Design a protein with these regions (language model features):
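Conserved PLP-enzyme active-site core in the AAT-like
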Residues: 2-293, 298-316, 324-331, 335
Length: 335
């Protein structure tokens, strides 16, 4: 089966499974799991932060970060396309009583600086207290421009705001930019990093930041049900991914470019963008459902919408992409 729906569908490889089965474990709620402790320390060092905290999901690590930065009645500024606003069930509002202030993203995924500045509310009992700027990198596959990140985080600091980066795919951004991940993490007070996407682990996210912030997030992790016991078996997969699956993300980026080039040869398809491991393209609305079914019958899983996303990952080869493009061509040729 060729699965282009997301990089979350990656499966652990036999060497990763071997690392998991050999993991030394303890009770992580007691702080006794040596493999979890090693993962947290390793990622903190790699990102240039003081401490790290292991979570079962990126949604939970983002939520704990927001709740660590903001109190009830506070507000965070965020892009309308951001995962922390659009795709996490409104958790910040539902569970943290934190109000989002969504702003329109520019074409490159950034939030215009003048819009950020204008959205910061004055200190007044009538308003929610603006406390945090939350960005995402990559966003829609796009790497945020480094100068933009520097300017946006500087603006936030000057106005008394903390900063959080949803870095679910920050290693994709680092590989694409040719920079160490610490350079992308440095401007932010906290960063969440996901291991169950392009890095290929079955589960896991780590939040990094200052020791004081992580201490607060640790309590919120417990409240949110994220405290786990002998979870070193999962942390071992993340450590394996850090050692073996980061540099190979460049292959996914090259495969995405190859996929986009193939779709561009099909008259009925309108390319929108390709960046890192994501390709966005438009298909005629009336063909989306039948094309998705056609592809599934041929062993290809997609989510065909008017504006469709295709995501490359370690379980998709160059030959798989050629098979997919040929199948799309075959579908339109038969009509």
């Amino acid at each position: 089966m060729i699965d282009l729906r997301s990089d979350t569908v990656t499966r652990p490889t036999p060497p990763m499974l071997a690392a998991m089965s050999a993991a030394e474990v303890g009770d992580d709620v007691w702080g006794d799991d040596p493999t979890v402790l090693r993962l947290q320390a390793t990622l903190a060092e790699r990102t240039g932060k003081e401490a790290g905290l292991f979570f079962p999901s990126g949604t939970q690590s983002n939520l704990a970060a927001l709740m660590a930065h903001c109190a009830r009645g506070d507000e965070y500024i965020v892009g309308q396309l951001a995962h922390t606003y659009k795709y996490e069930g409104g958790g910040a509002a539902v569970l943290g009583s934190i109000q989002p202030q969504p702003l329109e993203n520019a074409a490159d995924g950034s939030i215009p600086l003048d819009k950020i500045a204008a959205a910061i509310k004055p200190i007044d009992d009538h308003f929610a207290r603006t406390r945090l700027l939350a960005l995402e990198n990559t966003i829609g596959g796009k790497v945020l421009p480094a100068q933009y990140v520097a300017d946006a985080t500087r603006l936030a600091r000057e106005r008394g705001l903390a900063t959080h980066l949803d870095g679910a795919r920050v290693f994709n951004a680092a590989v694409a930019a040719g920079k160490p991940v610490a350079a992308l993490a440095e401007p932010f007070d906290s960063v969440s990093i996901c291991f169950s996407k392009g890095l290929g682990a079955p589960v896991g996210s780590v939040l990094v930041g200052s020791r004081a912030l992580i201490d607060v997030a640790h309590r919120w992790r417990k409240v949110l049900g994220g405290g786990m016991r002998q979870v070193g078996v999962l942390a071992a997969a993340c450590l394996y991914a850090l050692d073996h699956n980061v540099e190979r993300l460049a292959d996914d980026h090259a495969n995405a470019a190859h996929l986009a080039a193939g779709l561009e040869t099909i008259e009925q398809v309108k390319m929108q963008s390709v960046a890192t491991n994501m390709v966005f393209a438009q298909f005629p609305q009336q063909h989306c459902a039948p094309l998705e079914a056609w592809l599934k019958e041929r062993g290809i899983l997609t989510q065909m919408l008017y504006a469709s996303r295709f995501v490359t990952h370690m379980d998709v080869s160059r030959d798989d992409i050629d098979t997919f493009v040929a199948a799309v061509k075959g579908y339109f040729a038969a009509r």
